[in-house]
């Protein structure tokens, strides 16, 4: 951890590693969003063929769940795109509260993180 404290930012090589990880996660997230949108479109075009329970509430619940999943996925995509901007600006991995580097382990688990664990726990 001392190595992290001594550095002001990640090296260009480290940033490239994170960029590749973010781009991979971004591609997956966009594919999932497209899937959710297609499911919503299918339900809108032909609600009777996809799901029909004992009442019309089943279709509405499924529609709402898909909408929430799509919305959450859109937020993830925005966070990942913002992370790519930070990589480009060479500010990626710097905690927005403490100004210290976020650990590589945390960034690998949550590549769009903007808070170190120290700052997150303090919230």
Located regions from the model:
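Short functional micro-motifs and their immediate structural scaffolds
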Residues: 85, 101-103
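Glycine-centered tight-turn and secondary-structure capping sites
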Residues: 87-93
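Short cysteine-rich clusters marking metal-coordination/redox-active sites
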Residues: 95-98, 116
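Residues immediately within or flanking Cys/His clusters that coordinate Zn2+
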Residues: 74, 92, 113
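Short Cys/His-rich "knuckle" micro-motifs
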Residues: 105-109
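Conserved NTP-handling cores and scaffolds of large molecular machines
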Residues: 37-40, 91, 123
């Amino acid at each position: 951890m001392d190595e992290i404290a001594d550095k002001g930012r990640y090296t260009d090589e480290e940033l490239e590693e994170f960029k590749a990880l973010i781009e991979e996660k971004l591609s997956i997230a966009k594919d999932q969003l497209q899937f959710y949108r297609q499911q919503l479109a299918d339900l809108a075009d032909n609600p009777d063929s996809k799901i029909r329970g004992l009442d019309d509430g089943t279709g509405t619940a499924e529609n709402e769940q898909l909408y929430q999943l799509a919305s959450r996925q859109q937020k993830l995509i925005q966070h990942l795109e913002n992370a790519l901007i930070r990589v480009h600006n060479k500010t990626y991995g710097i905690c927005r509260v403490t100004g210290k580097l976020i650990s590589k382990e945390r960034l690998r688990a949550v590549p769009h993180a903007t808070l170190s664990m120290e700052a997150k726990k303090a919230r």
